[in-house]
């Protein structure tokens, strides 16, 4: 009887297995590969739980592909993140971890055996391109790599320039959250034309560490509308591929380069800064699937090479997340270092349940003076509310404490906003010690070089000062540079 039931069960399940296989057709030998990268966009998408907006085109990608729910960036600001992404390497391993480093007199060169991924595709016969949206003239889309590289790794800025039948490896850079610019011009003049109705600030839900203040509510509403614009652009890209008859020959990956630009988001290692959307659609990709395994954005490099049938360099730290022998990660790692002239060093390790953060400059406040962040309307308003004593005790503690904990530990399942630091709780001492050791091991194994040399820092400062044309940018930068030097002397 048991044998009969087993056979019957197998017969009943066989059609389902066949259907699943049909939903994920074998990719062509050399599929087109398209990375769509949204600037300053985190995981605040409807398919990840956001309730206030609709994104039908991104939802289509999810229905027709695979959504990764635990995808994380190894860096929380654009240039280290993009340097890591394009090489499949931790930015710390390749020395590209300081924001906009290598631009001055102190150049950064990739280690032996490490190349930008487009060069590997190009040698394999792919047409490589990187464009903004829409691509304009001959200019490339955003690169922002912190190392020396040859622009010839890109054949152009749009796959329209390829030979007939030539496969392409393309990147499309969406302006994303940067459309929420400081003077509000885009939102005032262009957003209504592009989107029609706009998200109402009073409808927005903020994380508990931000006050429900009109400035912050309006800013978050604009951010959600930036995501809606990205969705519209994704729809236009899909339509273009469909019209050309190549949608089903193209593997698409949608992700962000860092989280929302906000006080506790971009530049920091809380999930608001490093959790990224990661959606994949195309031949060989299971449809309507959700994966909960931990992945890092550097995995996109190895995975893309494998799709094209190209060997993954032995030194590459990213993994092919669709490989039959794929070893799931039990933890992911991230690093934050100098941003503009503001010196910092933070490292973290995150498992499915816990996140451990180490603040090397814990004697400094979270919101150090920063020319970039201090110009944001949200941070300006937060500083005003802090000065007026109008923030809650929680908001004061998390945003404006004069120092930071040397170590932070969060149960991200029970505390997704990372509010309750468990590092001093005896109940979690074993977890703290385990993750502390795990982070130490990762830093050693990946050869984390740590702080920037004073010579390199000064060279980066000189470059930043030269490119800052207005007194509004130069004066705070010079003031912050002197403060960083003073704090360094004081051992902060």
Regions found by a protein language model. Name each.
Residues 2-13, 19-408, 416-437, 451, ...:
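Formylglycine-dependent sulfatase
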